[in-house]
């Protein structure tokens, strides 16, 4: 994707942040709206299981599974895969609807960052404009809790680009074109 050459450095910086997070036992929290919510879910699907090649569980876990239940443990040891911890904040309908009803729906992602996030984790905010308020509230909460913030945006990068530790601002203006360029990045 030659069009992404201009954001190569930002992609590499985001990778380094994620690598450090995972090396230190952290997790990735992801949020977006509409197509960006779908991207959030897609990213989790790729990280929590093998992608391109199988990720076997550790020998220690395989043995513990067999010890816990020799019959099922053998199957689990063969079929489970190592995952990189990631949570799409877009999928918790009961929590989101209860928080929207009882408190403020705009803060649903922020509430989840508050509940799940810890220093050393990473928040990935996906917003084609960089100005989605609910994503911004989550990003502010993440920063306050000591999480690194990565923004995946387009256009000018918006408010999210200014707050993020790393902002990947794809060089497009139209929403569907921005979303098309987000896909090869993740």
Which stretches of residues belong to each language-model region?
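Generic N-terminal amphipathic, Lys/Arg-enriched alpha-helix
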Residues: 1-5
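Glycine-rich, small/polar surface segments that engage phosphate groups of diverse ligands
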Residues: 20-116
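Short glycine/serine/threonine-rich phosphate/pyrophosphate-binding segments
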Residues: 37-41, 106, 131-138, 160
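Short, glycine/polar-rich helix-capping loops at beta-to-alpha or helix-loop-helix junctions
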Residues: 151-164
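A charged, well-structured terminal subsegment
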Residues: 176-186
């Amino acid at each position: 994707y030659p069009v992404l050459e201009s954001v190569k450095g930002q992609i590499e910086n985001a990778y380094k942040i994620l690598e450090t997070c995972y090396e230190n036992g952290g997790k990735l929290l992801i949020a977006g709206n509409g197509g960006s919510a779908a991207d959030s879910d897609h990213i989790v699907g790729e990280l929590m299981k093998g992608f391109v090649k199988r990720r076997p569980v550790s020998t220690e876990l395989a043995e513990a599974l067999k010890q816990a239940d020799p019959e099922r443990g053998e199957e689990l040891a063969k079929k489970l895969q190592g995952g990189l911890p990631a949570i799409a904040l877009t999928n918790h309908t009961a929590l989101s609807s209860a928080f929207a009803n009882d408190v403020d729906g705009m803060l649903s992602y922020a509430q989840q960052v508050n509940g799940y996030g810890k220093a050393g984790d990473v928040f990935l905010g996906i917003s084609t404009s960089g100005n989605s308020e609910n994503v911004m509230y989550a990003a502010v909460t993440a920063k306050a809790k000591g999480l690194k913030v990565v923004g995946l945006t387009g256009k000018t990068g918006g408010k999210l680009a200014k707050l993020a530790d790393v902002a990947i601002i794809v060089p497009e203006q139209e929403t569907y074109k921005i979303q098309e360029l987000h896909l090869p990045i993740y």
